[in-house]
């Protein structure tokens, strides 16, 4: 039994204190934006941020939403198991989905610019039955992602501080629920930014401690020597020469395919990513998603290349938490490679940094899931089927209630998984089996006019039946005719289930579209979710920009995807190249350079891009403090904004009707 490095009081201080602190900060920020920047918290703004978010914040939000606890913990786990290939297979296998999703984000902006959720688009094109099918898949995705966040976060926090795991499961969502309620998706974007910056600072600290400052390692060359010794002591089955320093890893390649397939589901079917596309300014969707995808790659790659390999290098040292034993399979599956490596590397400081790192990763991604669930319930269930004429305030309160219920329901579900010994690693591999069957149909809804309604409706159902049967049959065949957590969680059953889940719906769609042919006119979709422009010229210009962005997104996404999943890794896999010390040093240096690019892209650039808004809020706040009254009167039926020119003191009153707001 490994003794916790920190006390329970430290854990409660972070989980409760910092969570409530963030909630208080976002309440203050939301109030400031309302009072000094004329941002009214209507249901529209709560769920879509009035379609106004710029490139930098979109990129930051994409990075933060995709930086789960598993991004840091599972990537380090796979590197510990398979060596340097594990970090790359995780990063590349989960990066390309964001880049390819850029295509769908632009198509959503072109064809349904005023939608609140992707499911609204499904209903408008394919009817209520298809809407119900995709509603189920969307909720399965949100439930799995939230469960994984809570399972991974609670296991790590409990191991580092000794906190009761059940208490962590219930306390982690509290602060997130509060600040998401008060700020909506705009608060999610802003906290995403803060969380991302903190995560990057901690990762850079770990990297510098490993490769430059720490006497335990101190350089890439010394870590290389340690990894050579580790490979000699316990070679990796399926790796070239049993080495940790090669991309030729049989089990690593299997994980790559599982990772690649499964993560299509958690991006393309998660309403949270569609929400960010909806909230983005039309001109910001393309650069925001591409910049976010490229920036995100460095996080798991460098985190795992550093901490996963540090665990291998220091595991035989007396100060490693499990010494003299290696980590158990359960500890590895629970994602404890990174925290144990941090403790061995930096002691109590490493434990504190890990606690903060995991807290930030869990809460930032959880806020996106809460908003996604809230939006679906508000617009796709309540307004669609319960109260079609619901007022803005009623929709806002409904959204608040739904995210509270979902947050605490997931705490209970995560607790059940904990007692059932279902780990974060198991859930991560299982995702694709359950949610990938909706990926191809969702893509077809936005891209192809000749896919029939029956094909879109039926193919996900047939796909999930096929994937579950395949998964369980392979598990039973390879596991001695018994189905357990161990046998169903093995690589081969998960590989089979994920691949069938992703690809079989494509076959079903083709067959059903041939049997039941149909051609859909996307102009009908545009008419349903049209944006209102001040002039016809503005509309023409916007259409031209989005058409151009559509072409660019397709070309850019395909080129970058090919580089990440084919051109870079497979030649190294095919040759079975064993890294030299010089090559390994260069590999690490590229990772460090890339993480500083990420800092610029999602840390510095959003501040520069939003400098005018920051100046306006600070100026108006200063004017209010020093006696110049700034009024912002907000009503449910409309908005009356009274502004003051700080230089001249002159007033201007602008009236907006409710219908004008809803059309923005």
UniProtKB/Swiss-Prot annotation:
Which cellular components does GO assign to this protein? plasma membrane
Organism placement in taxonomy: Eukaryota, Fungi, Dikarya, Ascomycota, Taphrinomycotina
What is this protein identified as?
Answer: Probable urea active transporter 1
User: Which molecular function term from Gene Ontology is one that the record holds?
Assistant: urea transmembrane transporter activity
What's one Pfam family here? SSF
Provide this UniProt record's keywords sorted from A to Z.
Membrane, Transmembrane, Transmembrane helix, Transport
Q: What does this protein do?
A: Involved in active transport of urea.
Give a yes or no for keyword Transmembrane in this entry. yes
């Amino acid at each position: 039994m490994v003794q916790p490095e920190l006390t329970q009081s430290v854990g409660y201080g972070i989980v409760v204190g910092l969570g409530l602190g963030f909630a208080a900060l976002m309440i203050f920020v939301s109030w400031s934006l309302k009072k000094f920047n004329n941002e009214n918290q209507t249901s529209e703004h709560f769920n879509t941020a009035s379609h106004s978010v710029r490139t930098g914040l979109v990129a930051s939000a994409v990075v933060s939403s995709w930086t789960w606890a598993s991004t840091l913990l599972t990537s380090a786990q796979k590197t510990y198991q398979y060596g340097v290939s594990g970090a790359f297979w995780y990063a590349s296998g989960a990066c390309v989905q964001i880049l390819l999703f850029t295509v769908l984000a632009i198509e959503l902006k072109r064809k349904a610019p005023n939608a609140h959720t992707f499911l609204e688009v499904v209903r408008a094109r394919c009817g209520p039955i298809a809407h119900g099918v995709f509603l189920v898949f969307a909720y399965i995705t949100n439930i799995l992602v939230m469960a994984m966040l809570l399972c991974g976060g609670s296991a790590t926090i409990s191991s580092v501080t000794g906190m009761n795991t059940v208490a962590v499961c219930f306390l982690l969502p509290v602060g997130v629920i509060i600040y998401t309620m008060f700020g909506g998706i705009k608060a999610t974007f802003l906290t995403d930014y803060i969380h991302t910056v903190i995560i990057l600072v901690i990762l850079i600290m770990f990297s510098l401690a490993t490769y430059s400052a720490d006497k335990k390692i101190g350089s890439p060359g010394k870590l290389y020597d340690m990894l050579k010794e580790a490979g000699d002591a316990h070679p990796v089955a399926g790796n070239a020469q049993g080495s940790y320093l090669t991309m030729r890893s049989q089990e690593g390649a299997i994980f790559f395919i599982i990772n690649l397939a499964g993560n299509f589901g958690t991006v393309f079917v998660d309403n949270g990513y569609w929400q960010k596309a909806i909230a983005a300014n039309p001109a910001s969707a393309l650069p925001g998603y591409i910049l976010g995808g490229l920036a995100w790659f460095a996080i798991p790659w460098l985190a795992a290349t550093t901490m996963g390999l540090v665990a291998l290098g220091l595991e035989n040292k007396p100060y490693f938490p499990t010494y003299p034993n290696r980590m158990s399979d359960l500890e590895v599956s629970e994602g404890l490679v990174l925290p144990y490596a941090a403790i061995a590397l930096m002691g109590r400081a490493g434990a504190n940094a890990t606690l903060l790192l995991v807290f930030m990763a869990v809460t930032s991604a959880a806020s996106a899931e809460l908003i996604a669930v809230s939006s679906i319930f508000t617009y796709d269930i309540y307004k669609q089927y319960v109260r079609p004429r619901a007022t803005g305030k009623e929709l806002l309160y409904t959204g608040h209630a739904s995210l509270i219920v979902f947050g605490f329901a997931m705490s209970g579900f995560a607790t059940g998984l904990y007692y059932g010994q279902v780990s974060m690693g198991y859930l991560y591999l299982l995702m694709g089996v359950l949610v990938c069957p909706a990926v191809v149909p969702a893509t077809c809804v936005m891209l192809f006019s000749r896919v029939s309604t029956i094909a879109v409706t039926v193919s996900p159902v047939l796909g999930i039946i096929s994937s579950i049967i395949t998964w369980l049959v392979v598990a039973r065949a390879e596991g001695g005719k018994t189905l357990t957590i161990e046998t169903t969680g093995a690589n081969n059953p998960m590989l089979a289930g994920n691949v069938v889940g992703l690809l079989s719906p494509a076959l079903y769609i083709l067959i059903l579209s041939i049997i039941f042919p149909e051609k859909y006119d996307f102009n009908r979709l545009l008419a349903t979710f049209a944006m209102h422009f001040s002039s016809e010229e503005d509309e023409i210009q916007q259409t031209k920009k989005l058409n151009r962005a559509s072409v660019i997104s397709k070309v850019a996404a395909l080129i970058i995807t090919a580089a990440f999943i084919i051109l870079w890794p497979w030649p190294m896999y095919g040759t079975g190249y064993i890294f030299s010390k010089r090559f390994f040093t260069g590999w690490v240096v590229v990772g460090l350079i890339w993480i500083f690019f990420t800092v610029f892209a999602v840390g510095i650039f959003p501040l520069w891009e939003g400098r005018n808004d920051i100046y306006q809020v600070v100026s108006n706040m200063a004017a209010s403090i020093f006696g110049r009254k700034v009024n912002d009167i907000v009503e449910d039926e409309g908005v009356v904004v009274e502004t003051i020119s700080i230089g001249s003191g002159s007033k201007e009153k602008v009236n907006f009707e409710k219908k004008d707001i809803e059309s923005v």
